[in-house]
Design a protein with these regions (language model features):
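A short coil/beta-turn micro-motif at the C-terminal edge
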Residues: 146-148, 198-200, 210
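Short, charged, solvent-exposed linker or helix-capping segments at domain edges/interfaces
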Residues: 214-216
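Two-component histidine phosphotransfer core
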Residues: 1-32, 36-175, 179-193
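Glycine-rich nucleotide-binding loop
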Residues: 139, 161, 198-205
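C-terminal beta-strand of the catalytic ATP-binding
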Residues: 206-212
Length: 216
């Protein structure tokens, strides 16, 4: 009897792990925007006829971006901030090739914390797509520093801003932001706040208490 109970418990645990993995993959997939994939391929195609060296460089960046996204699908634990920054830089460089009017700046003074994969990159993507891309000179800044017993990560832009985050958007932007918030809370006991002003820009602040990462 005890053996059958043990077998049943093993089955339940395995089933729960499978459901958790499926849920995690579903969340991650919402962070990978198909429009970016198609637009990047179109940009590479256009570059091939004009600048083969730039086209080759962009292909390399795009390959690295896809590889890291696929790795993120299997990432059940938090990752070092430096790894997420690296992924964000690859994404941002591709976008800066496509849109010469934007630039992404970094001020990383604290890399001692760990965060969920695909946390900063989707926020930078949102800042570019819905904030600075239409600006004559669009700027996104990513900063990380320590303040007391908290790790702070700040993503801010000089974009169009907004008065209220929409309940739902056609491209899944709001869903993606809420997924970042949810994973930050569950995996790091962290918080995310958004401050935005129309025609001035948006500021997103991630706060993680030092040593409070759950899955490490």
């Amino acid at each position: 009897m005890m053996y059958y109970i043990w077998l049943h418990l093993q089955f339940v645990r395995k089933h729960e792990r499978a459901l958790q993995a499926e849920h995690r993959i579903q969340i991650m997939m919402t962070q990978i925007q198909p429009h970016f994939l198609f637009n990047t391929l179109s940009a590479i195609r256009a570059l091939i006829g004009k600048d083969q060296k730039a086209a080759s460089h962009t292909v390399g960046l795009f390959s690295a971006y896809l590889r890291q996204n696929l790795e993120s699908l299997n990432q059940a634990e938090v990752i070092p901030l430096s790894k997420e920054i690296e992924h964000t830089k690859i994404y941002a460089e591709i976008e800066m090739i496509r849109f010469p009017n934007i630039r992404v700046e970094y001020d990383i003074r604290d890399e001692e914390c760990c965060i969920p994969a695909l946390t900063i990159q989707p926020l930078v993507e949102n800042a570019i797509r819905h904030g600075v891309r239409s600006r004559k000179e669009g700027i996104v800044r990513v900063a990380a520093y320590r303040e007391g017993n908290e790790h702070l990560i700040v993503i801010e832009d000089n974009g169009t801003g907004f008065t209220e985050l929409p309940a739902k958007s056609e491209d899944g932007t709001h869903i993606g932001i809420e997924n970042v918030r949810e994973r930050l809370e569950q995996m790091c006991n962290g918080t995310m706040t958004i401050d935005s002003k129309p025609d001035e820009g948006t500021r997103v602040i991630l706060r993680i208490t030092a040593g409070k990462e759950v899955n490490r």
